[in-house]
């Protein structure tokens, strides 16, 4: 592991593995950060780059009032300690620590350095409380422009028990399935595509080559979550219209209903004609 990130990075990862070519892990001084680091190391492409970015959010220390100075010291120390533990847990290509807002800095680094996947730990809360009170996970869901791994305890540094993919016939779901199947083949995991039978089912999702699909009479969110366990990885696709900030209610419902980690595969918008 290097003490400081180089000016630029690159990876030979291609095809479905390309999103695992440059993994950027957010470290914020919480145990969930270590889970994100471990799982980021598992999914990283064989010739991929993994970077640990620790961020001490020192502005939070001001909430301690007269004890702000002590709180600031403790916050910085905790973040540095988590970075050191993460560096021992995963073979990172680069690691560094800074201060500011974790998600903003991750997004800036993603744009500046071409990261293909951000990994961040999620604390145990539900969607309503996350949307009401905020948090790094919900900020990352709204603000990141690359693929995102929302990490929960259950696997890592070992592979997930199986990979569960949300399938609905959309381009985003197709991209997620391609990535999920490729990752499953590389890690040696079973892949379970889940198809909801609620409403009009796209005939394309029932094609012959998807004989391993799990057909479920429940709505897709419930079906996907029901097919997963704590040791699984759910893979779901998302899209973003040009000029609009993404707000994926469907993906949020998956993320906050699931008991396991969720990989959100970013499907870039088509170029205008």
Regions picked out by a protein language model, each given a short descriptive name:
Residues 119-122, 147-153, 262-266:
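Short beta-strand elements of ligand-binding domains
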